[in-house]
């Protein structure tokens, strides 16, 4: 598949034209990515996990190049320090929490890992998964039996990102929340405030809302910041009568390249109407 000189050695392609041969250069396709971001799904025992199927079916229909779960797939309500000692804490079990989280991920993946479709999978550990690691720190005698390292995420095909370590995909940083380096706590404020603070495009979860900010840069490009922290189909009693009135859904980023993408937001209400059995 090439030209040889009189000694039998290959002639470099850049010399072919001088010998009267033309070479058709292979164009490298610079295709922007399509990325689906699954917000916090917070699977727990005794709730329906059908919403994971709806999300998975949508992913299969749209076939993004990358699927990012932004964290808090496992609720780990048995490890909540806020509820300990309350009546609502009665009956919670770690084993049931793990089983619910594992089942939710199986339901999600089963809907789109088929027919040759195999997107890149990225999982950003959330603060709810961090509860499991905190237990391992507090009870070192259980090392190897507890902690996120015992969850089957990697075996399921996910690239697992440590809690609060951002991952850069085409110039956009994905992480459960943006942490203030002085305190380790989440940055507050709107998506625009956070975008101005960190100076890079980002997608985060954690906060039960939908907030998006876009701003131009001096080089003629754009940056984007997205907060989308809920993709579960149940209400949380602790949030009260109005606290549950927030957006629930996922995000699809189209034409992702050079730190920007065009967002589309898909509500669980829409997914339920389209895919509910």
Q: PLM features: residue spans?
A:
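Acidic, histidine-bearing metal-coordination/catalytic regions of metal-dependent phosphoesterases
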Residues: 1-38, 42-45
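Conserved beta-sheet core of the metallophosphoesterase superfamily
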Residues: 175-266, 270
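Core dinuclear metal-dependent hydrolase active-site scaffold
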Residues: 17-30, 35, 165-192
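Short acidic low-complexity segments
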Residues: 151-170
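Residue-level marker for buried hydrophobic side chains located in beta-strands
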Residues: 35-37, 67-69, 123, 202-203
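Polar, enzyme-active/binding microenvironments
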Residues: 29-37, 61, 268-276
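Core catalytic region of metal-dependent phosphoesterases/phosphodiesterases
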Residues: 43-155
């Amino acid at each position: 598949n090439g030209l040889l000189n009189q000694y039998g050695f290959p002639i470099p392609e850049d010399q072919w034209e001088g010998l009267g041969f033309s070479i058709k250069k292979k164009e490298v396709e610079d295709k922007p990515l399509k990325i689906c971001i699954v917000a916090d799904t917070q699977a727990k025992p005794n709730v329906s996990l059908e919403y994971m199927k709806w999300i998975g079916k949508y992913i299969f229909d749209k076939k993004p190049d990358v699927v990012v779960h932004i964290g808090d797939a496992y609720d780990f309500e048995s490890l909540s320090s806020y509820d300990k000692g309350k009546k609502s804490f009665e009956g919670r079990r770690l084993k049931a929490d793990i089983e619910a989280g594992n089942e939710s991920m199986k339901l999600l993946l089963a809907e789109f890992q088929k027919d040759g479709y195999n997107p890149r999978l990225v999982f950003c550990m959330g603060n709810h998964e961090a509860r499991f690691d905190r237990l391992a720190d507090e009870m070192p005698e259980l090392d190897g039996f507890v902690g996120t390292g015992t969850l089957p995420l990697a075996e399921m095909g996910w690239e697992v990102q440590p809690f609060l370590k951002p991952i850069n995909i085409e110039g956009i940083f994905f992480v459960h929340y943006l942490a203030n380096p002085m305190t380790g706590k989440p940055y507050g404020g709107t998506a625009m405030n956070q975008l101005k603070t960190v100076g890079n495009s980002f997608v985060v979860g954690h906060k039960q809302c939908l907030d998006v900010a876009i701003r131009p840069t001096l080089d003629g490009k754009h940056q984007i910041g997205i907060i989308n922290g809920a993709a579960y189909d149940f209400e949380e009693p602790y949030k009260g009568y109005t606290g549950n009135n927030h957006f629930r859904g996922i995000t699809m980023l189209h034409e992702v390249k050079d730190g920007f993408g065009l967002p589309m937001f898909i509500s669980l209400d829409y997914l339920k109407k389209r895919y509910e059995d």
